[in-house]
């Protein structure tokens, strides 16, 4: 009888463990847009979707991101957070339709980013207030009512907050305007999205031991540009950071990004924000592998990433 009771207890405990696991799925990361400001029929502009269970977080929404979200089957009315790395057009051009979808939902949601985010969002609301009221009126709701469920937040380096069970932290990174990198942690999984940046201090520490580092592909060698681009990349190695009395570069190069990944002990280095043209992966990898020995991914639109438990490189 005692043996039977022990068996029942073990089976019940195993069942509860499985239920808990089912209720706490891993982070899923999808590159919604892997392109740059250039029009590219194969890549839309910047966007990354982080999901965990029913939680949806969109980081950046350049031109074409709304269309790719639809292709991916995302219900924009259930978006929990819309985050900007910075306010360049290739990172925020699709905000209006994505924001409208979130407003037409019924849950609370957050819009956050660096300085000017509040003005950007409020200008959008003021411009489209009659249209938004009309759309919401079809379900007997008003814009004022829905705005009670919206939080707009301007972020600075070192801010920490939660979106449901996902922990979010921020780091200011050097670019041509104020820019923020994000880190998402859930259980033992972590994803870092840098947005656009030039070389600067603190990124490796911020990204330490992350499963996936999604980073600016500045300086990537492209077949279309051939030897000229390759020589430019090699010449600029280690020189793209901000230096006293010298011009601030908009983007780091692949030696610098791969060094960050190595210093941070990253599991997977994921490149995005590609310019128009064909990537010379072989030539680029020769530079990257001098610093970083882990897995390297050249992302494409709608690519799903496995940013789960870390494996030994």
What are these regions (language model features)?
Residues 58-62, 79-90, 112-114, 192-195, ...:
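Active-site neighborhood of phospho(di)ester-bond hydrolases with catalytic His/Asp-centered motifs
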Residues 63-112, 209, 213:
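Active-site metal-binding motif and surrounding structural segment of the metallo-beta-lactamase
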Residues 1-8:
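Bacterial N-terminal signal peptides that target proteins for export
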Residues 190, 198-303:
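Cap/insert and terminal regions of metallo-dependent hydrolase folds
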Residues 29, 48, 60, 69, ...:
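Divalent metal-coordination and catalytic microenvironments
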């Amino acid at each position: 009888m005692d043996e039977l009771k022990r068996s029942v207890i073990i089976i019940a405990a195993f069942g509860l463990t499985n239920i808990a696991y089912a209720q706490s799925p891993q982070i899923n990361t999808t590159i919604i847009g892997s392109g740059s400001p250039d029009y590219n029929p194969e890549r839309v502009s910047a966007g990354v979707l982080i999901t965990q269970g029913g939680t949806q977080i969109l980081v950046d929404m350049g031109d074409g991101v709304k269309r790719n979200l639809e292709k991916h089957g995302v219900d924009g009315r259930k978006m929990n957070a819309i985050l900007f790395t910075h306010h360049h057009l290739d990172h925020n051009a699709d905000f209006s339709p994505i924001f409208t979808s979130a407003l037409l939902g019924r849950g609370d949601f957050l819009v956050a980013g660096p300085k000017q985010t509040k003005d950007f969002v409020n200008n959008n609301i003021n411009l489209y207030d009659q249209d938004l009221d009309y759309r919401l009126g079809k379900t007997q709701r008003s814009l004022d009512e829905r705005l009670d469920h919206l939080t707009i937040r301007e972020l600075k380096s070192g801010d920490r907050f939660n979106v449901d069970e996902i922990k979010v932290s921020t780091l200011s990174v050097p670019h041509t305007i104020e820019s923020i990198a994000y880190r998402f942690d859930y259980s033992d999984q972590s994803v870092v999205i840098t947005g656009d940046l030039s070389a600067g201090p603190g990124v490796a520490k911020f990204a330490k031991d992350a499963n996936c580092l999604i980073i600016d592909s500045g300086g990537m060698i492209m077949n279309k540009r051939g030897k000229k681009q390759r020589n430019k990349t090699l010449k600029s190695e280690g020189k793209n950071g901000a230096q006293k009395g010298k011009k601030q570069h908009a983007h780091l190069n692949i030696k610098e990004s791969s060094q960050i990944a190595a210093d941070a002990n990253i599991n997977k280095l994921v490149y995005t924000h590609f310019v128009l043209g064909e990537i010379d992966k072989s030539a680029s990898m020769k530079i990257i592998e001098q610093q970083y020995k882990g897995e390297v991914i050249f992302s494409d639109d709608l690519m799903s990433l496995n940013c789960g438990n870390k494996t030994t490189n």
